[in-house]
Amino acid sequence: MPYNHREIEPKWQARWEQDNAFVTTEDPEKEGFYALDMFPYPSGAGLHVGHPEGYTATDILARMKRMQGYNVLHPMGWDAFGLPAEQYALDTGNDPREFTAQNIETFKRQLKDLGFSYDWDREINTTDPKYYKWTQWIFTKLYEQGLAFVDEVAVNWCPALGTVLANEEVIDGLSERGNHPVVRVPMRQWVLKITEYADRLLEDLDELDWPESVKEMQRNWIGKSEGAEIDFTIDGHKKQVTVFTTRPDTVFGATYLVLAPEHPFVTDITTEDHEEAVKAYIASVQTKSDLERTDLAKEKTGVFTGAFAVNPISGERLPIWIADYVLATYGTGAIMAVPAHDERDHEFAKQFDLPIIEVVKGGNVDEVAYTGEGEHVNSQMLDGLSKQEAIETIIAELETNQVGRKKITFRLRDWLFSRQRYWGEPIPVVHMEDGTMKTLDKSELPLELPMIPEIKPSGTGESPLALAEDWLDYTDPVTGLKGRRETNTMPQWGGSCWYYLRFIDPHNEEAIADPEKLKYWLPVDIYIGGAEHAVLHLLYARFWHKVLYDIGVVPTKEPFQKLYNQGMILGENNEKMSKSRGNVINPDEIVKSHGADTLRLYEMFMGPLDASVSWSENGLDGARRFLDRVWRLFERTADIQDVTTVDADFERVYHQTVKKVTEDFTNIQFNTGISQLMVFVNEANKQPVLPRHFLRGFIQLLTPVAPHLGEELWEQLGFEDTLTYAAWPTFDETKLVSDTMEFVIQVNGKVRSKLVISMEATKEEIEALAFADEKTQEWIGDKTVRKVIVVPKKLINIVAN
């Protein structure tokens, strides 16, 4: 009877559900293992074949660890707030809750069809008020710690859509949806002070077992720079402009200053004759995103303000320009330009014919900026000094004259945390009539998102919540003071910053989770997901975790001990899968045609888990053929026997298989572990008798990858219990190597025969066996043996003529 996945897979899925097979055990005597997937956004499109790749990896580990005697926490949930559901609501007039619930149902069905061993009792959904009560509670704690504040921030405002857009939603000054013009305008926003944690976020990376590339991306994003601040007075004004530079030693090479167009001094210092040009330039910049403005490849633009600054060290007058490549949100929003030794400044100086003064020897600065090291020149007291000596000398000079100071800065910006959207967590803040602000008490949470008959932009820059008039009104239960609720909502990042904590104790109504449970399960042992979350999600989650650590909620400094990024599955033509290319593969179709176990096996066998690999129908068919061979092997019921003596070669292959699969699966090298399972099947097919205990061990090794087939074969072998908790097989070190080996016999340097000889055979015994071999005798014939060379454990060469 051929292997029928359409019968076998639903049978075992129903059995697992009925038995609640994967409920998390919490035996205090056992060690815990927390295997976490990056939970998905439940989109309308459902799962694609990229999702199961990471999910199968964590499932293999979870299933293996259960058999190895661990308590395993392997949960799944939904990161369900976000733009697509809101856009759907705007486009159709339907409630995003319905859309989200339908999508979750589809995703959940698909995940169950793939046989993942999730503990569905712990399912969470970021849009559930019982969940976001705690997201809001964490926000109140951030506020109490002074880490959440309101600020005027320049945002991407799209008048046509009546809403604020994230940088990713703006392309070439137009909205991604509808191609409407977008302008930069200042707006009141909630900001989280992640910069307070910059040093710790940087230092603690060293303690994590993460891909080096991800750690490096986070280091660059945090961007720690050591240098100095220098104060330049403005000619004819009482104001001074402070700039930050990592090269204060080049201060004598500064030939102009550049302010960001949004710098608060621009209006005051611009002279009358330059006013019109400055205003026009500022207007032109408003349609550009920060990314476009800082693009190194683009042509430099800028305009002179008519004002001059005074170099505090040399006394030189320097023209003050504004240019879009300087951002108000970075550093001090102003730079001292040293065109001889900075590429962007050099391009700008060439563009606008500004002076270029060499202060570090080593290049031809008229042609190109010299950014290397060298002796200082044209720099008064710094002449002849090296870079480090010059930096120390000039900082001392700046501090003595009180015109500058040593300074460490970070590229990391504070985190803009509010969105002018409906479909997000309401921010638990009230603006009171007396002008104060208060966060809601824990007893007033969750602050639920109100049902609105029609979700549409308010048009004022506020979220659609500004239209929910009854909901907006608030009366303080203690003082009776009236207030108006905050209308901004949280970004999608809010709910995903801490979800791994809620999985630990998802039904707790008094706290995020029981402190003892947090202590038991944290940090997460393995976190698998795509590299696209390398910076934002992982940095934000680390930040929140550290705040929770500081206030005594969590017991560890870091949330995720080991992180692993799976690669991307590309289309057959090596292109990224996308709807527009028409090369997206739906896992439902594969489950129907080949089976879930085939899909799981194929995706793990495609190549190393972290590599990007092209989809191949041939490869998929090959995976199915292997499972068919396994099925046929177990159809040899008469050959499956309880035996006391076994074939030595087969025994060796079995023990090698247990060892290699255990090690490879533990090290997330699933493709090579699966190769070894194939070696075992090849060897088994040569055997007239199949020892039952070898086949039993093989099923257990195969099951984490192909659980439905594994359970079916386990039942066929006569076991009544599920193998979810069957003890993982062990190997015997002494059985890994053979006590005999194949020895090559050469006559006059050519291979003429082979013999199986004991590993312990002496040189004399090997010679005797070789000369007794019939084939060897034929080749020697009546020749005279001149010499015999024995290479231990390899070959014997007989020289005869």
UniProtKB/Swiss-Prot annotation:
Keywords: Aminoacyl-tRNA synthetase, ATP-binding, Cytoplasm, Ligase, Nucleotide-binding, Protein biosynthesis
Gene3D superfamilies to which the protein is assigned, alphabetical: 3.10.20.590, HUPs, Isoleucyl-tRNA Synthetase, Domain 1
InterPro entries listed in its UniProt record: aa-tRNA-synth_I_CS (IPR001412), aa-tRNA-synth_Ia (IPR002300), Leu-tRNA-ligase (IPR002302), Leu_tRNA-synth_edit (IPR025709), M/V/L/I-tRNA-synth_anticd-bd (IPR013155), Methionyl/Leucyl_tRNA_Synth (IPR015413), Rossmann-like_a/b/a_fold (IPR014729), tRNAsynth_Ia_anticodon-bd (IPR009080)
Single GO MF annotation: aminoacyl-tRNA deacylase activity
Motif 'KMSKS' region in this chain: 576-580
Pfam families the record matches: Anticodon_1, tRNA-synt_1, tRNA-synt_1_2, tRNA-synt_1g
Stretches of the chain forming a coiled coil according to its record: none
Compartment annotation: Cytoplasm
Motif 'HIGH' region, chain ranges: 40-51
Main location: cytoplasm
Record-listed E.C. numbers: 6.1.1.4
Binding-site positions, ATP: K579
PROSITE patterns: AA_TRNA_LIGASE_I
CDD domains: Anticodon_Ia_Leu_BEm (cd07958), LeuRS_core (cd00812)
Disulfide bonding pattern of the chain: none
GO BP terms: leucyl-tRNA aminoacylation
Family assignment from sequence similarity: Belongs to the class-I aminoacyl-tRNA synthetase family.
Name assigned to this protein: Leucine--tRNA ligase
